[in-house]
Amino acid sequence: MSFSQAVSGLNAAATNLDVIGNNIANSATYGFKSGTASFADMFAGSKVGLGVKVAGITQDFTDGTTTNTGRGLDVAISQNGFFRLVDSNGSVFYSRNGQFKLDENRNLVNMQGMQLTGYPATGTPPTIQQGANPAPITIPNTLMAAKSTTTASMQINLNSTDPVPSKTPFSVSDADSYNKKGTVTVYDSQGNAHDMNVYFVKTKDNEWAVYTHDSSDPAATAPTTASTTLKFNENGILESGGTVNITTGTINGATAATFSLSFLNSMQQNTGANNIVATNQNGYKPGDLVSYQINNDGTVVGNYSNEQEQVLGQIVLANFANNEGLASQGDNVWAATQASGVALLGTAGSGNFGKLTNGALEASNVDLSKELVNMIVAQRNYQSNAQTIKTQDQILNTLVNLR
């Protein structure tokens, strides 16, 4: 009789308890994937066998629960995909833990300082360069440059029953010489705001002269001729004159803004008071970075004090042919191996890649109730193998005491 079978059983049961204990210990670790010990019998030419061995430890890569945190740099993956990280030596690792922060160089890093990689954003305005080599994502604390207005719009409802003004000619300083005044604020090359006043003067039925004046420029000359004439049909629908090109004055040495002002969707109706429905334009002043977040498509976006946002990069995800072939490196990261296959890169929601949820984290997929039951079973297994050794010892004692 040999003790080897029971000893192998003790070793296997101890390993199983270690795996279960590791699962329980990491039940609150974001992005953790539970492990399972697999066993195989040892056979050496006899029907009895030589016991048991640990064949391997596999990981369960099913999704954990998505837990909302509300933090802008937290992001959870659901379904397929891993975050791609690089360490200080340039080695590449992969993780499901989406807890990120800024380091001293304003790189997005995980809690161990590994840099999150993605596609860069370049150009003016910045655009994502998908397909480029992934690089560490940085959130620069730089000023967002001003943008000169190139297009603007004003939607107005004009009252068809308004009389032609009694005062002529038109004057910006005489409210009796026009029917309605509106303002659209536009920006020049330095981000200086220009309040462009727009005056509407009824000249006859279904026709309105439009005058424009840059009230922010002290040197601006008051207009004496109309910039355009709005002509409506008998149903009050604008037929012509709905677009005019305007150039602002010059302030502080900036280049003047030349933009197209559209009155499309404006109407003439018997509606009571003349009404400016909406104004819009595409320029803005400079802005400081105020906040930043990761969106559900993986884009990293900065929010600026000028109420604009700017894309700073986009997270890349990695897929593998065989997730179980990844080698665990601790710190909640894995390394690619020959068994896992090479990493296939892409973005969230594209192809076979999973989805991202911003302001959330993927919880551990450990089923704590199941692991506690498994621990009891493993403990009984250990005790049973110990009892086998005890029984064999008693048999040997009996043999020794034979006379």
Swiss-Prot record:
GO cellular component, one term: cytosol
Record's subcellular location: Bacterial flagellum basal body
Keyword list, A-Z: Bacterial flagellum
InterPro entries named in the record: Falgellar_hook_FlgE_sf, Flag_bb_rod_N, Flagellar_basal_body_rod_CS, Flagellar_FlgE/F/G, Flg_bb/hook_C_dom, FlgE/F/G-like, FlgE_D2, LlgE_F_G-like_D1
Superkingdom in the source lineage: Bacteria
GO biological process: bacterial-type flagellum-dependent swarming motility
Family recorded in the similarity comment: Belongs to the flagella basal body rod proteins family.
Identification of the protein by name: Flagellar hook protein FlgE
Organism: Salmonella typhimurium (strain LT2 / SGSC1412 / ATCC 700720)
Gene: flgE
